[in-house]
Amino acid sequence: MSESSIKIENVVASTKLAEEFDLTVIESQFEGAEYNKQKFPGLVYRVSDPKAAFLVFTSGKVVCTGAKNVADVHTVIGNMAKKLNSIGIKTMENPQITVQNIVASADLHTILNLNAIAIGLGLENIEYEPEQFPGLVYRIDEPKVVVLIFSSGKLVVTGGKTPEDCESGVEVVRQQLDNMGLL
């Protein structure tokens, strides 16, 4: 699939690192942490190597976003657990990390006629209102992803749980456009 290989833009994952957190303690110990419960019920903490951001909640749950691959998610969550342990906050060992969403981009390297694609894919499978949004929204059942198709030939795939889901979504689009003679 060299002509349309994906680039992962964002991985969102969640885990439970403890039974509960005192977010004011974490905010006071983690440089750059932001916590204002009047504005948002969680603490925001950004890391740079690898780059990611955390939303940390009093329930002990943590959401990691901004990572560029699944391995980085595991790395930064492991680093977060170590940092919490270093300030005396006990964390769970081997927490289960669940990927919630992967956003990826791809390029078909050709100009696309979105009106023809909308008709070809069937209006029941797509949303296309160019006055409101320049892309065609295509919901695929297998893999269960949403692909935004742009006239530039660029694609954005969202909803995947694995990089393979995103690759498969791009391949489904490529095959269908090819079958319609639109590639």
Curated annotation (Swiss-Prot):
CDD domains: TBP_archaea. InterPro entries: TBP, TBP_archaea, TBP_CS, TBP_dom_sf. The keyword tRNA processing does not apply. GO terms for biological process: DNA-templated transcription initiation. Sequence repeats lie at residues 8-84, 99-177. Keywords: DNA-binding, Repeat, Transcription, Transcription regulation. PROSITE patterns: TFIID (PS00351). The keyword Hydrolase does not apply. GO terms for molecular function: DNA binding; DNA-binding transcription factor activity. PANTHER family: TATA-BOX BINDING PROTEIN. Belongs to the TBP family. General factor that plays a role in the activation of archaeal genes transcribed by RNA polymerase. Binds specifically to the TATA box promoter element which lies close to the position of transcription initiation. This is TATA-box-binding protein 2. The gene is tbp2.
